[in-house]
């Protein structure tokens, strides 16, 4: 059993049959690209596994959605990883940094992902359109994420923000939200 399999089993995260194959290829590509381009702080295979588990964990509580947008995808956390585990959802990964967007495009092509689209621009430059799910990890505070995501929300859209313990300081003015606590993470789920 690989480290990733063990971590997923410990958190009772069940994924589709292709997830582990995609994750393995992704890890190999990330390790290779990261040496040259410094795409993420996760440097070792174990750290990358932790990032993958952190990114995919919300599939344990997310309802099925048709469309999703990830703001500030970086090296693929969480958007690319969620796309591996949610093959029926079309993901738009928004990443303005050219080196990271190039990596995401390469992963999409190398893995033959049909449910991923990469936008190499800032989210503020995207044409407004509604998404069922909007995600973000390590980009900015909740209020700014609410402003950035506003043109892309519709009634019933879900917002999923990957937060730390300070999330409780950011929700005082919110209603219609849940905080799901898992290992080393607080997932803020807001219904608009």
Protein language model regions, located:
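Class I SAM-dependent transferase core
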Residues: 2-65, 69, 99-102, 106-116
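Residue-level preference for alpha-helix termini and adjacent loops
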Residues: 14, 38-39, 76, 125, ...
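N-terminal cationic-hydrophobic initiation segments that often serve targeting/anchoring roles
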Residues: 59-60, 83, 150
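Conserved beta-strand/loop positions that form the S-adenosyl-L-methionine
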Residues: 71-73
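Conserved SAM-binding loop of SAM-dependent methyltransferases across substrates and taxa
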Residues: 75-88
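S-adenosylmethionine
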Residues: 89-92, 96-192
């Amino acid at each position: 059993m690989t480290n990733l399999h063990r971590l997923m089993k410990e958190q009772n995260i069940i994924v589709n049959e292709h997830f582990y194959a995609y994750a393995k290829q992704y890890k190999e590509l990330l390790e290779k690209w990261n040496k040259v381009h410094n795409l993420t702080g996760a440097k070792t295979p174990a750290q990358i596994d932790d990032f993958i588990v952190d990114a995919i964990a919300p599939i344990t509580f997310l309802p099925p959605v048709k469309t999703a947008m990830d703001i500030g995808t970086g090296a693929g956390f969480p958007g690319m990883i969620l796309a591996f585990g949610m093959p029926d959802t079309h993901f738009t990964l928004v990443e303005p940094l050219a080196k990271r967007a190039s990596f995401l495009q390469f992963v999409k092509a190398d893995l033959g992902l049909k449910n991923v689209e990469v936008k190499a621009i800032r989210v503020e430059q995207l044409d407004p359109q509604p998404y069922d799910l909007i995600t973000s990890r390590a980009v900015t505070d909740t209020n700014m994420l609410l402003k950035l995501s506003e043109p892309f929300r519709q009634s019933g859209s879900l917002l999923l923000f990957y937060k730390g313990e300070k999330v409780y300081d950011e929700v005082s003015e919110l209603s219609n939200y849940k905080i799901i606590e898992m290992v080393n993470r607080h997932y803020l789920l807001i219904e608009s």
